[in-house]
Regions:
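Nudix hydrolase/Nudix homology domain
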Residues: 2-8, 12, 16, 72, ...
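Acidic pyrophosphate-coordinating catalytic loop
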Residues: 19-23, 39, 79-81, 126-138
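Acidic, metal-coordinating catalytic segment for phosphate/diphosphate chemistry
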Residues: 20-65
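Short, well-ordered beta-strand micro-motif
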Residues: 29-31, 60, 141-143, 166-168
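Active-site-adjacent beta-strand/loop module that shapes the phosphate/pyrophosphate-binding cleft
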Residues: 32-36, 129-150
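Conserved Nudix-box catalytic region and its N-terminal flanking loop in Nudix hydrolases
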Residues: 47-50, 67-107, 153-158, 162
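Acidic/glycine-rich phosphate/pyrophosphate-binding loops and surrounding catalytic core
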Residues: 116-121, 127-128
Length: 205
């Protein structure tokens, strides 16, 4: 990578913001200018922004058995891109106002998978699609007992129909390699576990 001594741009100005749609999610149109890498300022540009709650995703891991607990559910976003919109995913949920990410992790583990976490390990935080969305993801690993995990879960009031499955670590990684797991947070979390598995097993076993 070519190194440069030029400073990174930091200045921007939002000149106008319009709401285009308001439902469970929101779509806004922003008009803005921002500093350029050459030191100048851009002309006014417009960008559509998908506004949504920040999210928490958790990989439940039983270090003693070297097993992960994953969920499957129907995802409307995958309807037109794949022949099977039932995706293999992590336990996940949206952060409500005044909630801490850790609270969401524990709540969703119980609601979506019937699990109680003994501890949480922060993996990373990231923007999944910052070119058009402000969603920010908090990614954790949760210490769990996988024995007896499984079955159908989810809140009927939210239309959730969730199947919980237990995987050996090796089988889960093979599902990533085979393209059966195509959810980004799940892939990131499993690859992180692959890099840190020995340490985690030493601490949580």
């Amino acid at each position: 990578m070519t190194q440069t001594t030029r400073s990174v741009p930091t200045a921007f100005e939002i000149t106008r913001r319009e709401n285009c749609f308001q439902g469970f999610y929101k779509l806004d149109k922003l008009y803005l200018r921002h500093e350029l890498f050459d030191g100048g300022t851009s002309k006014e540009i417009s960008r559509e922004l998908f506004v949504r709650h920040d999210a928490v995703c958790v990989l439940p891991y039983d270090a003693k058995r070297d097993e992960v607990v994953l969920i499957e559910q129907f995802r409307v976003g995958a309807v037109q891109k794949t022949g099977n919109p039932w995706l293999i995913e992590l336990v996940a949920g949206l952060i409500d106002k005044d909630e801490q990410p850790e609270e969401v992790a524990h709540r969703e583990a119980e609601e979506e998978a019937g699990l109680v976490f003994g501890a949480l390990w922060p993996i990373t935080k990231y923007f999944p699609s910052p070119g058009g969305s402000d969603e920010f993801v908090h990614l954790f690993m949760g210490q769990c007992d996988s024995q007896g995990a499984g079955g159908l879960h989810g809140l009927e009031s939210e239309g959730e129909d969730i199947r919980v499955t237990v995987w050996s670590f090796d089988d889960a990684m093979q599902a990533v390699a085979d393209g059966r797991i195509i959810n980004a947070a799940t892939i990131i979390a499993l690859q992180w576990l692959a890099l840190n598995r020995a340490e985690i097993r030493g601490l949580w076993s």
